[in-house]
Amino acid sequence: RGTPGRMMLVKNPAGCNQTMRYLAGLNEDATFVVCLNDRDADGTDISWIWDADFERLAAMGEHLRHVYVSGVRADDMRLRLKYAGVDEVRIEVFYDYDPLIDAMCASEYPVFIMPTYTAMLDLRGRLQKQLGGKEFWE
């Protein structure tokens, strides 16, 4: 709907840290989305989020306009971001992807989505359904 967005898969501390380095280097206002699932295909142990450098996200300061969290383990992700130092007024939890997509589309800032594997599949399917477009593999 006109809001630029980019989706970057995160599934372990190393990959997540690379994504954080990239995002911190953008030096621009943005909305960030973290979707955390713990299904078999993701790996059921999400303790890796405590090893990932989400403090780098918090250090973005005023450029960090909003952080939306979603997925099966959204509450765990919210807690991790709180301990990383992200201002809690910037964190919003979405337990369903449809209102999350509405919020992303309403963002006046570029949206950077960081999902785990099954969250990526779920969210991509919902985005395609709501916004149109072909499936990724078509």
Predicted regions located by residue number:
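ATP-dependent carboxylate-amine ligase
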Residues: 1-138
